[in-house]
Amino acid sequence: MPVGGGSNLIVSDRPRTVAVSTSAFDLVEANGRKIYAGAGARLSKIMRTAEKNGLSGVEFWAGIPATFGGAVKMNAGAFSSETMDKVLYIDVLTGGKVKRLWKSGINYGYRHTETDGIILGGAIALEPSSPDAVRQKTREYLEKRRQTQPAGKSAGSVFKKVGGVGAGKYLDLAGLKGKRFGGAVVSEKHAGFFLNDGGATFEDFRRLADYAADKVWQKFGVKLEKEVVYFE
């Protein structure tokens, strides 16, 4: 299984799956209004390239500790923007050959992108701006994250939105803030995030997620779908 930065993965204490890192594919090149990035390029690196070249459009990535390949696969997003909004095409390895997939031919949606093969890289289209303006917008997004999201160890949002409503709202209303199993605990700051406050195991996290989803179902009749990926 190919993995990027692992920021949305919950890894088993005894995984049976072999992980293949894409970190070597970290090329980032700007060409006019476009930037090509390898699957292993950190979003922060792409953002620095965009800022340097006065290109705006991916400031919403600020604070997301992911690689480009992972962001494409999960269609990572924030602040009403998503990665696939900016993608022109992606290059994938399939059947031993490299194939270019243009966005018009890719099936994608909220927090998922279907790809026939392993993502190697891709191009994004941005808008002309200035380095100062891009830098300021990035700072604003970072500040919003600091104000609303916990700073502890987490894998990001555990569950996807439901009908445009953040799962954290349901978890909060279900009284789950502070609920824990072992070292895994629901954040007091934002119930959509589960924290590892020291020594949390894979089973701690899974039990907490299952418990939380069950409570929301019982109270609201709402079925939560995981945004994190279990790696077993």
What are the language-model segments listed below?
Residues E29, E59, D91, V228-V229:
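Residues embedded in well-ordered beta-strands within globular domains across many folds
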Residues A50, F68, V72-A76, D91-T94, ...:
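Short, well-ordered alpha-helical segments in soluble proteins
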Residues P2, T83-D85, K179:
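Short solvent-exposed loop/turn micro-motifs enriched in small/polar/acidic residues
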Residues G57-L88, S154:
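A gly/ser-rich beta-alpha-beta helix-loop segment of oxidoreductase catalytic cores
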Residues I10-L27, K73-K103, D116-G121:
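Structural signature of FAD isoalloxazine-binding scaffolds in flavoprotein oxidoreductases
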Residues L9-V11, K45, F68-N75, E82, ...:
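Basic, gly/Ser/Thr/Pro-rich low-complexity segments located predominantly at protein N termini
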Residues L9, L93-E232:
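Phosphate/pyrophosphate- and phosphate-bearing ligand-binding catalytic cores of soluble enzymes
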Residues M1-F68, V72:
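Anion-binding (especially nucleotide phosphate/pyrophosphate-binding) glycine-rich loop
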